[in-house]
């Protein structure tokens, strides 16, 4: 919004030219979202406590988690509010990627809100059924897939997927690309949701992935840089950096309250939309497989659940003491904070490897 207000006045007051620069507006976005979280955080935590919107902890989980029972949840509302407000202020609202990301934020955020609401209403740790959540995610992903098919940002690469570390090598999904889009969005949304089981674990890794994708988006949107790095140039993708920096600021602000011992949990209200928008960004900038590496912590967490379910149904035995994977390490005796920090470190290492893929080919 600020771009549309001030940049058009730059002919009258030259300093307003600064609003044309993505780097300036991205800086404004991260500071705004961070400030909103810091200021609104205590108020939202208090309101959630007053309305008794509190976490229902699974009784079959680690015993150390029983103390978390009663911690305010639905904190994803704080993240969503700060991301949307900051993006609305600093991004160009005529950019189609921004409009889609805001739509995805609200759609998946509402889906997560419904899940959290049902958990509170039933006083149970189970809200929406898995089928209902996947259906809601799939509907949105299918609409986006249709849009990307009929209005691709770069028709030449519309159904191609870049393979990291291999120069100029692409996989052509052809008519299966729509299915690929659905898998990316549904998969990333649920992977983050499954990772959100320890204080600060999911939001810390979201910060790492979102910050890294910010740079990838900026590179993809800059013709000279994209050409130098031999990645697909996507017109308008640089604006995505502003949205992602809003996510980074919100994540850091939320981590202030979500770090161990957590004062608030994001719930599905936060995790579903955060995972979903990361998947959307990877599709927009044509770095879908880089997200698999960059978000490797989320991928491994999701795979641990799938492996556990599949193996248990086939043999009646468990591969892990408990899934997702972070609970397995807790059951082995590692402290919650140690598991969280080690997963953060793994996230940083994966981010470094992801950036290495830009040059090591």
Curated annotation (Swiss-Prot):
Q: Which UniProt keywords apply?
A: Cell cycle, Cell division, Cell membrane, Cell shape, Cell wall biogenesis/degradation, Magnesium, Membrane, Metal-binding, Peptidoglycan synthesis, Transferase, Transmembrane, Transmembrane helix
Q: Which pathway? A: Cell wall biogenesis; peptidoglycan biosynthesis
Q: What is its main location?
A: membrane
GO BP annotations listed: cell division; cell wall organization; peptidoglycan biosynthetic process; regulation of cell shape
**Could you tell me the membrane topology recorded for this protein?**
Multi-pass membrane protein
> Which InterPro entries does the record match to this protein?
Glycosyl_transferase_4, PNAcMuramoyl-5peptid_Trfase, PNAcMuramoyl-5peptid_Trfase_CS
Q: Which cofactor does it need?
A: Mg(2+)
Entry-linked CDD domains: GT_MraY
The record ties this protein, via PROSITE patterns, to: MRAY_1, MRAY_2
Q: Which reaction does it catalyse?
A: UDP-N-acetyl-alpha-D-muramoyl-L-alanyl-gamma-D-glutamyl-meso-2,6-diaminopimeloyl-D-alanyl-D-alanine + di-trans,octa-cis-undecaprenyl phosphate = di-trans,octa-cis-undecaprenyl diphospho-N-acetyl-alpha-D-muramoyl-L-alanyl-D-glutamyl-meso-2,6-diaminopimeloyl-D-alanyl-D-alanine + UMP
Under Gene Ontology molecular function, one entry of this record is: phospho-N-acetylmuramoyl-pentapeptide-transferase activity
| Subcellular compartments | Cell membrane
Residues spanning the membrane? 26-46, 71-91, 97-117, 134-154, 168-188, 200-220, 236-256, 264-284, 290-310, 338-358
Q: Which GO terms describe its cellular component?
A: plasma membrane
Q: What is its EC number?
A: 2.7.8.13
Q: Name one Pfam family in it.
A: Glycos_transf_4
Is this entry keyworded Transcription regulation?
no
Function statement: Catalyzes the initial step of the lipid cycle reactions in the biosynthesis of the cell wall peptidoglycan: transfers peptidoglycan precursor phospho-MurNAc-pentapeptide from UDP-MurNAc-pentapeptide onto the lipid carrier undecaprenyl phosphate, yielding undecaprenyl-pyrophosphoryl-MurNAc-pentapeptide, known as lipid I.
Q: Which NCBIfam families match?
A: mraY (TIGR00445)
User: PANTHER family of this UniProt entry?
Assistant: PHOSPHO-N-ACETYLMURAMOYL-PENTAPEPTIDE-TRANSFERASE, PHOSPHO-N-ACETYLMURAMOYL-PENTAPEPTIDE-TRANSFERASE HOMOLOG
Family statement drawn from the similarity comment of this UniProt entry: Belongs to the glycosyltransferase 4 family. MraY subfamily.
Q: What is this protein called?
A: Phospho-N-acetylmuramoyl-pentapeptide-transferase
Species, as recorded:
Endomicrobium trichonymphae
């Amino acid at each position: 919004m600020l771009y549309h207000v001030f940049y058009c006045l730059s002919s009258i007051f030259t300093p307003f030219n600064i609003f044309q620069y993505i780097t300036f507006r991205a800086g404004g976005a991260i500071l705004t979202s961070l400030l909103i979280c810091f200021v609104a955080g205590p108020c939202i935590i208090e309101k959630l406590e007053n309305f008794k919107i509190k976490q229902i902890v699974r009784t079959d989980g680690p015993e150390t988690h029983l103390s978390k029972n009663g911690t305010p949840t639905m904190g994803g509302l704080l993240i969503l509010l700060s991301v949307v407000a900051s993006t609305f202020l600093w991004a160009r609202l005529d950019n189609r990627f921004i409009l889609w990301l805001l739509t995805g934020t609200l759609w998946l955020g509402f889906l997560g809100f419904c899940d959290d609401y049902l958990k509170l209403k039933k006083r149970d740790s189970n809200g929406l059924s898995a089928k209902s959540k996947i259906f809601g995610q799939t509907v949105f992903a299918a609409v986006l897939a249709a849009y990307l098919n009929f209005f691709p940002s770069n028709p030449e690469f519309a159904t191609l997927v870049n393979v990291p570390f291999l120069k100029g090598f692409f996989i052509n999904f052809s008519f299966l690309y729509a299915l690929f889009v659905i898998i990316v969005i549904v998969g990333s949304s649920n992977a983050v949701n499954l990772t959100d089981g320890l204080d600060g674990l999911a939001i810390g890794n979201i910060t790492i992935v979102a910050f890294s994708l910010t740079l990838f988006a900026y590179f993809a949107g800059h013709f000279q840089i994209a050409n130098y790095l031999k990645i697909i140039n996507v017109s308008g993708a640089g604006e995505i950096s502003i949205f992602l920096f809003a996510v980074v600021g919100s994540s850091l602000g939320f981590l202030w309250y979500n770090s161990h011992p957590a004062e608030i949990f994001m719930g599905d209200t936060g995790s579903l939309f955060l995972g979903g928008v990361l998947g959307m960004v990877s599709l927009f900038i044509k770095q879908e497989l880089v997200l698999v590496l960059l978000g490797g912590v989320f991928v491994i967490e999701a795979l641990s659940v799938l492996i556990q379910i599949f193996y248990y149904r086939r043999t009646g035995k468990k591969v892990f003491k408990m899934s997702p994977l972070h609970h397995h390490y807790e059951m082995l005796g590692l402290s919650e904070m140690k598991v969280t920090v080690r997963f953060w470190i793994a996230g940083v290492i994966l981010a470094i490897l992801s950036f290495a893929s830009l040059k090591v080919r």
